[in-house]
Amino acid sequence: MIRKAFVMAVNPDAHAEYQRRHTPIWPELESVLKAHGAHHYSIFLDETRNLLFGVVEIESEERWNAVAQTAECQRWWQHMADVMPSHPDNSPVSQALREVFYLE
């Protein structure tokens, strides 16, 4: 498995709404993520800095990157664009993080 981590932002007034929309995520999106090899996917909120930290284990970069091309993912991005900084295609502004420590 490949571990990935990334940081995004959430609008300061949208913490509760961001969490509400993920409780639970759409079943169709969950199916897409699992079908594309995503496992143990978590998102953590730093409320003081309005930052979201995502951590996911994936089976392959190619399959993970293909998630973005699915209708379900694009629909999800559109659904979330009003609560977080997003690109013109509605994908969230995201920065990959480099792993510096891991304990199994």
UniProtKB/Swiss-Prot annotation:
Organism, as annotated: Yersinia pestis
InterPro entries per the UniProt record, alphabetical: Dimeric_a/b-barrel, L-rhamnose_mutarotase, Rham/fucose_mutarotase
Organism domain of life: Bacteria
Annotated signal peptide: none
One Pfam family from the record: rhaM
Subcellular location: Cytoplasm
GO molecular-function term, one example from the UniProt record: L-rhamnose mutarotase activity
GO biological-process terms attached to the record: rhamnose catabolic process
Gene name tied to this protein: rhaM
Residues that hold substrate according to the record: Y18, Y41, W76, W77
Main location: cytoplasm
EC numbers: 5.1.3.32
Listed pathway(s): Carbohydrate metabolism; L-rhamnose metabolism
Catalytic activity: alpha-L-rhamnose = beta-L-rhamnose
Family designation: Belongs to the rhamnose mutarotase family.
Protein's name according to its UniProt entry: L-rhamnose mutarotase
Subunit composition and interactions: Homodimer.
GO annotation, cellular component aspect: cytoplasm
Annotated function: Involved in the anomeric conversion of L-rhamnose.
